[in-house]
Amino acid sequence: MERARDRLHLRRTTEQHVPEVEVQVKRRRTASLNNQECHVYLRRSQQQQVPVVDFQAELIQAFLAETPRGG
């Protein structure tokens, strides 16, 4: 009886481990897709010659304006 129970337990644990790997693979796929999208976006911005530095400065100013000073 104990051996059969051990086998059942082993089978259950292996079945539980399989989907985790699938999830990791899916995550990797989406990550690589996102990277490609980023590269495409970067190429577009280079073609349009968007001033990225100015945009960053604007972001910082907006962030500072929103955060309450003197905590």
Curated annotation (Swiss-Prot):
| Coiled-coil boundaries | none
For the keyword Nucleus, the answer is: yes
Q: State the organism's lineage.
A: Eukaryota, Metazoa, Chordata, Craniata, Vertebrata
Chief location bin = nucleus
- Mind listing the UniProt keywords for this protein, alphabetically? Nucleus
Q: Which gene holds the coding sequence for this protein? A: SNURF
Name of this protein? SNRPN upstream reading frame protein
Q: Which cysteines are joined by disulfide bonds?
A: none
Q: Where is it localised?
A: Nucleus
Q: Name one GO cellular component term.
A: nuclear speck
Q: What else is known?
A: Encoded on a bicistronic transcript that code for two proteins, SNRPN and SNURF.
Instruction: Please report which protein family the annotation says this sequence is part of.
Output: Belongs to the SNURF family.
